[in-house]
Amino acid sequence: LSDWSSDVCSSDLLMCDMRFAARSAKFAETYVKMGLIPGAGGAYYLPRIVGVAKALELFWSSESIDATEALRIGLVNRVFDDDKLAEETQAFASKLARGAPLAMKLVKRILYRGLETDLRGALDLVASNMPVVRMSEDHQEAIAAFREKREPKFSGK
């Protein structure tokens, strides 16, 4: 994200699994200042990302925050110099692309579903998915690659 990200744009931002920002980026939730309430999922996502108290502060005050503060409160995952944002984001995406797709998909599913349950339910989610990944071609490839001291080539199976 670069330049200003506010209101409608930030609702889209909040729906992302990971958020990177340029150092010059600023963020604001100006609904209340406009006599409105947050729509498009903002009131759902923001407190889950930054906590209820910080979400209320951002909504009620309508104050803008810079990228450094957004990083500090967990609104964004990483901040890069403006001229490096695209390059660094691409480098991170390339790093993720080398991961095991099935395991990545299941980690995401377990994390998000885990937010809706208690510890026992979260552990059950892990237990029910562990055989899937342990029997996967990707896991076998990871073991072979480790033994052969090479990078794995995952298939997503």
PLM features: residue spans?
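Hydrophobic alpha-helical segments typical of transmembrane helices
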Residues: 42-45, 54, 66, 106, ...
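Single conserved hydrophobic/aromatic residue that forms the stacking wall/gate
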Residues: 1-12
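Short acidic-aromatic low-complexity motifs
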Residues: 61-65, 137-141, 149
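Conserved catalytic cores of soluble enzyme domains
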Residues: 14, 24-75, 90-96
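Terminal low-complexity tails and localization/encapsulation signals of metabolic enzymes
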Residues: 144-157
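Short aromatic/basic micro-patch
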Residues: 4, 64, 79
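A short alpha->beta transition loop at the rim of the catalytic pocket in nucleotide-sugar-dependent
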Residues: 17
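C-terminal long alpha-helix characteristic of the crotonase
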Residues: 20-25, 67, 76-124, 128-131, ...
